[in-house]
UniProtKB/Swiss-Prot annotation:
<keyword id="KW-0963">Cytoplasm</keyword>
<dbReference type="InterPro" id="IPR049083">
    <property type="entry name" value="TACO1_YebC_N"/>
</dbReference>
<comment type="similarity">
    <text>Belongs to the TACO1 family.</text>
</comment>
<dbReference type="GO" id="GO:0006355">
    <property type="term" value="P:regulation of DNA-templated transcription"/>
</dbReference>
<dbReference type="InterPro" id="IPR048300">
    <property type="entry name" value="TACO1_YebC-like_2nd/3rd_dom"/>
</dbReference>
<dbReference type="InterPro" id="IPR002876">
    <property type="entry name" value="Transcrip_reg_TACO1-like"/>
</dbReference>
<dbReference type="GO" id="GO:0003677">
    <property type="term" value="F:DNA binding"/>
</dbReference>
<dbReference type="GO" id="GO:0005829">
    <property type="term" value="C:cytosol"/>
</dbReference>
<dbReference type="InterPro" id="IPR017856">
    <property type="entry name" value="Integrase-like_N"/>
</dbReference>
<dbReference type="InterPro" id="IPR026564">
    <property type="entry name" value="Transcrip_reg_TACO1-like_dom3"/>
</dbReference>
<protein>
    <recommendedName>
        <fullName>Probable transcriptional regulatory protein Xaut_3062</fullName>
    </recommendedName>
</protein>
<keyword id="KW-0238">DNA-binding</keyword>
<keyword id="KW-0804">Transcription</keyword>
<dbReference type="InterPro" id="IPR029072">
    <property type="entry name" value="YebC-like"/>
</dbReference>
<keyword id="KW-0805">Transcription regulation</keyword>
<dbReference type="Pfam" id="PF01709">
    <property type="entry name" value="Transcrip_reg"/>
</dbReference>
<dbReference type="Pfam" id="PF20772">
    <property type="entry name" value="TACO1_YebC_N"/>
</dbReference>
Amino acid sequence: MAGHSQFKNIMHRKGRQDAMRSKLFSKLAREITVSAKMGLPDPNMNARLRAAILAARAENMPKDNIERAIKKAAGADGENYDEIRYEGYGPGGVAVIVEALTDNRNRTASEVRSFFTKSGGNLAETGAVSFMFDRVGAIEFAAEKADADAMMEAAIDAGADDVTSSEHGHEVICAAESLAEVQRALEAKFGEPKKAALVWRPQNTVAVDDETGEKLLRLVENLEDNDDVQNVTANFELSDALLAKLNAE
């Protein structure tokens, strides 16, 4: 299992979640505004906007905040954000992809580079590590929506490539270009998903020792705490012992 999938629940452990909630809402609103600006402000006609709204709802972002972010896209004096992807190597040579929405490229690049350097890694050129990942569609449903067999059957019928089911829910993986089609088919059967978005999926993962794993987690936390960073993906795998320790904290 990819490192980021392993620790995404750890990142929301008690204390951290409350501390990040206001910052998270700001990031979600930024993605909604940018998505609405890039296409129509109607989520039924704009797949990216729909995905952004789904992500906001999954985090219990108030409806008023969502609507305000959409309306902001129509404002003539609204901020303009650039989409930037940074790629680099973290501790242990682990590949890391950082996606950002920024109104100041120089500031964000400097801050991201600093995080990599302080962790013992280094920021590289665009394209340096992305070839180690596949760009795919990911659709997440709550566990109670269906049992594993029903979800697998429906997903394959809809054209998906893979399904992972656990007590935490179902994750359906499909080709990037098939995301909207697969999502519609599964929504018709199971209702609205928790999440539907394009993601980076590691082709292979790297096992790291516990010391390196903790350094990588700190790097990811620092990156995700940055106001401009939207997503962080890495290709490492944590040991069961470290996962158990972190989950107990």
